[in-house]
Structure formats: structure tokens, C-alpha cells
Regions:
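Active-site nucleotide/adenylate-binding loops and adjacent lid/helix of ATP-dependent enzymes
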Residues: 1-118, 166-171
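Membrane-targeting and insertion segments and their boundary/processing signals
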Residues: 14, 143-147, 200-204
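Hydrophobic faces of well-ordered beta-strands that scaffold small-molecule active sites
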Residues: 17, 54, 185-187, 204
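Glycine-centered flexibility motif
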Residues: 25-27, 43, 62, 141, ...
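A long amphipathic alpha-helix within ATP-dependent nucleotide-binding catalytic cores
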Residues: 50, 100-195
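C-terminal active-site "lid" helix and adjoining low-complexity regulatory extension at the edge
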Residues: 152-168, 178-182, 191-237
Length: 237
């Protein structure tokens, strides 16, 4: 009831609505350009399915990067691209998703480097913001994004940026990890321009159970063998 009363405060404002304590991008809806009361209310309903407490956050512009910190050092950085399909001018979004999901790197249950793309309520809401639906036929060469959040767990693609991000942001990620008292964690950071150390940035989340294997098998880029860093931390090697 309290959430519904507050809806009018957020109409047409760039916001993120998400459960307080979930992982893997579950229950999250993002409205980078703002939206109407109906979509906000539906986003609340989805989020409350997963937690008794729901957060409303300001949407931060930029691209999201996952910094994997192990024992006070950054051992991998991924840019995660939201679930998407590339049009051919013939197939619908539904058909393109089915085709992309045939990639052997994609599976279900977080046992593969990438997850299969889902076509559910969250994806339908995000496509609606683009005046599209699952039966839309993208133009040849047109990329259509199905979600705003870029989690691998919701069908996103992964690109390794470990060697490309300025040391300044690696140091910030380590400081965030230390502040949280974590020896292993994933720091999610938004950067407007990853190549500029003076760019705007924001830490949007710290994860205490980060997926390590996604850095070992990126969709694009260098494979990072980070399991050995965990073994070193545990003094097993």
C-alpha cells in the first residue's frame, strides 16, 4: 500500500525498482527514460514477489562493469551487455531468441558461462517502452535489447575489459571490497567512459557471492583463470 501511494513521485523519472535482497537480476525493472504509473505499479508487484522490501533507486547513466575482487586485488573485469538479439529482417524477436539460445555456452541454472534468454514479464515491459513486443521483426542489422539490466543470469553477453580499465577504478573497487569486509566479491560499477579516468562513475552494488566462471569463459575477450586465485586465498596452492 505504501509503495502504491508513492508511485506518483516517480512517474516519468529515470528509476530502478528492485527487491532488496535478491541475486542474479531477479525481479528488477529499469526505466532509464522514466515511465507511467501503470508500469511502475507492475514493477512493484514483480519485485514484491521476491522480497518484503523493495528499493527505488536513481538510474545512473553509463555502462556497467563487474570487477571481481579476490584478496584485495582485481582479477577480472567484465562488461555485461543486456540480453539482446540481432535482426535479420525476417525473424521475430521470439524466433531470434530461440536461435540465440541454441549456443552451447548458454544453459539454465548458472552452470554454464552464459544463461538462456527468457521471454517473460520483465522482457515484455522493457520491449513495451520501445513500442515493441515478442512478435516484432527487427530490421537487418538492428540490435534489440530485451532488458536494461545486464546480468549474465538474465541472458546478457559478457566482454572482458580487465586490461582496458584504468587503475583508478580498480583501486576504487578494492576499497569498496575492503569497506564491506569481503575477501571475495563482485563490485558493480557504472562508468560513462571506461577509457577516461576522470569520467563519472558510481558503485551500484557489491555482491558477496559473485560468479567466478563468467570471467573464465567470456562471450568475447580473454579468458581469466581466476579459480587459482581462490585456491591461493584458501592457501591450498
Amino acid at each position: 500500500a505504501e509503495a502504491k501511494i508513492s508511485i506518483n513521485n516517480y512517474i516519468e523519472k529515470p528509476i530502478v525498482i528492485k527487491p532488496k535482497s535478491t541475486n542474479f537480476g531477479t525481479g528488477i525493472n529499469i526505466f532509464p527514460e522514466g515511465t507511467n504509473a501503470e508500469d511502475i505499479e507492475r514493477a512493484f508487484e514483480i519485485a514484491f514477489k521476491f522480497d518484503k522490501t523493495v528499493l527505488i533507486e536513481e538510474f545512473i547513466k553509463g555502462k556497467e562493469y563487474r570487477f571481481l575482487v579476490i584478496d584485495d586485488q582485481v582479477v577480472g573485469i567484465l562488461h555485461r551487455v543486456p540480453a539482446n538479439v540481432l535482426g535479420d529482417g525476417v525473424k521475430t524477436i521470439r524466433e531470434l531468441v530461440e536461435l540465440k539460445n541454441q549456443n552451447p555456452l548458454r544453459g539454465k541454472g548458472y552452470v554454464t558461462p552464459l544463461e538462456k534468454i527468457n521471454l517473460g514479464e520483465n522482457e515484455a515491459i522493457f520491449l513495451k517502452q520501445q513500442n515493441k513486443n515478442f512478435d516484432y521483426v527487427p530490421l537487418a542489422g538492428e540490435t534489440v535489447y530485451l532488458r536494461e539490466n545486464s546480468n549474465i543470469s538474465t541472458g546478457g553477453d559478457s566482454i572482458d575489459y580487465t586490461d582496458d580499465i584504468p587503475q583508478k577504478f580498480k583501486d576504487i573497487a578494492v576499497k569498496a571490497s575492503k569497506a564491506a569486509g569481503a575477501k571475495i566479491c563482485g563490485v558493480d560499477m557504472m562508468l560513462e567512459d571506461y577509457s577516461d579516468e576522470n569520467t563519472n562513475y558510481a558503485i551500484i552494488e557489491i555482491n558477496f557471492n559473485p560468479a567466478i566462471h563468467i570471467h573464465s569463459y567470456p562471450f568475447i575477450g580473454t579468458e581469466r583463470k581466476n579459480a587459482v586465485e581462490v585456491l591461493k586465498l584458501l592457501e591450498l596452492v
